[in-house]
């Protein structure tokens, strides 16, 4: 296929798609140019069904530093593991694409997005999401798209689609929404305490804009789209399924209705093991035993799936016996740990998170050097999910995509209420350790983070709580669930996380397993989430009503002084010599910004005070009219040099020593003598003249004797 180009304008910027020129051996490939951002997307599919009980989809988003005209950092000067932003963008693209493949599809699919040029005012992630959908749609991969995504901002009561950098900085909302022509199927958002009505309207505005992008994709597919390949879907043997359902469905239903998680898991596992043992023995000599046992496992999973959904939709009974809108038992604790700067333990049913606060000087902020201009990140929220939290063994190592994503969600939820840098000049790190998990651990980490911040004396604007909403839908009827547990998440159709304060929403995240959800479901879920959020905030505020007025004794104290910008080099010294000497002497940490704000951190107030004195002395300047207690350091015939302070000397001319005539300076002064002087002049070169006699009352002039006349 020769190169073909398709052009439109979207959100005020040119959107150009090129097909047929590059990556022609992939099943589908596109080059998307949005503004001056350029993204190459290639989609490929394995020829055979993969083993395993899941769909092996891999979406990558690769940031090439050359795209922004930068050299990679580090010794190797080559791109390494994906940045946090790249990982989050890959997840952002994966989530709306994944539901658009058929049930039982098991071929491996890879979608690789490479950023070739970067324009900070034209969203490369949105170009990559568009390119991913289009590459799959024009390929022979059986993808039931297209989908598209947009960013939505909110400034002065107006919604803005794909805002540029300046607009995003002024926006009260940072929303990414994706979906198909019919419905929304992915949401990711941070917001500055916006109402449910505004958030819902933003979602609908975003979905309207998505229609333009989908229509554009459909035009391209009509011209260059390939015929979809016939692939084998994972389907179980119908006779085997009927046999197992008839014999064991009642037993499995009974096991599913056990309320306590561990007991329920044990009961369902016992039934499954009994069934597997029977059929493994029955077909032991069959050459297709592996396929049969795979089908048995899949049938049992489908039976459990069907019973959980039936209980909720028909009987309105949840696996643990709760009502549809009921939250599990809550508990909130502060000061769980000594020595740390703040800690909070939050428990919701069998989900538990411990959050630990650490405060540090601003010099500890994380420097982010990606495709965007380098910047410093003041607030970090890290989420850890050890396998013991679900009673299992498993991999331990660096944070995976899921942990990075959950940490980022908590970060967005909490950063909206943090004090400004001027109010609270600290770098802030929260670490969420998930100790138990039965669903919604990311929201528990938000609640625990609120407790830790307030216990640590961080003056947040308001406490934040999070809740996860679920959905069971048969296409006609649906049920929205409050505070979903693991089983409801696994067998349900939606995981909709909502975090916020009493004033409004600070973060949203939605993933679904069906093609999309309607505005009615979104509205109902947001309303139920608000009610639940307020219930959780009641528990948090009963434990700690407001941030403590003081930091923990172990937290670094801070004081700030302002110096002239031209004095920064004086405090730092040649090669940092002066500031290093101060730090070595006092044991403090010092940060100096470009405006001359000096922040001094230490747990010892006396050390802070001493540091302030040293710095004040370094930057101090003599002023005309001020009086100084000085020390004579040198004597010359024409006067004496005195030290006013630190490295600032002044000349007391011989004529300024006394009102009477001074013949020899050494007759009046000696080196090391303390004298009081007044600065009377500073010339253009900074040389200081001082006077001793200016501080002495001038003696009266002698009266003239009257002449006698004869």
UniProtKB/Swiss-Prot annotation:
Entries under SMART domains matching the protein: KH, S1
Keyword Nuclease: no
Domain KH: 556-615
Signal peptide residues on this chain, from the entry's feature table: none
Domain S1 motif: from-to ranges: 625-693
UniProt biased composition (Basic and acidic residues): 700-710
SUPFAM superfamilies: Eukaryotic type KH-domain (KH-domain type I), Nucleic acid-binding proteins, Polynucleotide phosphorylase/guanosine pentaphosphate synthase (PNPase/GPSI), domain 3, Ribonuclease PH domain 2-like, Ribosomal protein S5 domain 2-like
Pfam families per the UniProt record, alphabetical: KH_1, PNPase, RNase_PH, RNase_PH_C, S1
Binding site for Mg(2+): 489, 495
Region (Disordered): 691-710
UniProt subcellular location: Cytoplasm
A cellular component term, taken from the record's GO annotations: cytosol
CDD domains the record matches: KH-I_PNPase, RNase_PH_PNPase_1, RNase_PH_PNPase_2
EC number: 2.7.7.8
Keywords: Cytoplasm, Magnesium, Metal-binding, Nucleotidyltransferase, RNA-binding, Transferase
GO-annotated molecular function: 3'-5'-RNA exonuclease activity; magnesium ion binding; polyribonucleotide nucleotidyltransferase activity; RNA binding
Broad EC category: transferase
A Gene Ontology BP annotation from the UniProt entry: mRNA catabolic process
Role: Involved in mRNA degradation. Catalyzes the phosphorolysis of single-stranded polyribonucleotides processively in the 3'- to 5'-direction.
Similarity-based family: Belongs to the polyribonucleotide nucleotidyltransferase family.
Protein name: Polyribonucleotide nucleotidyltransferase
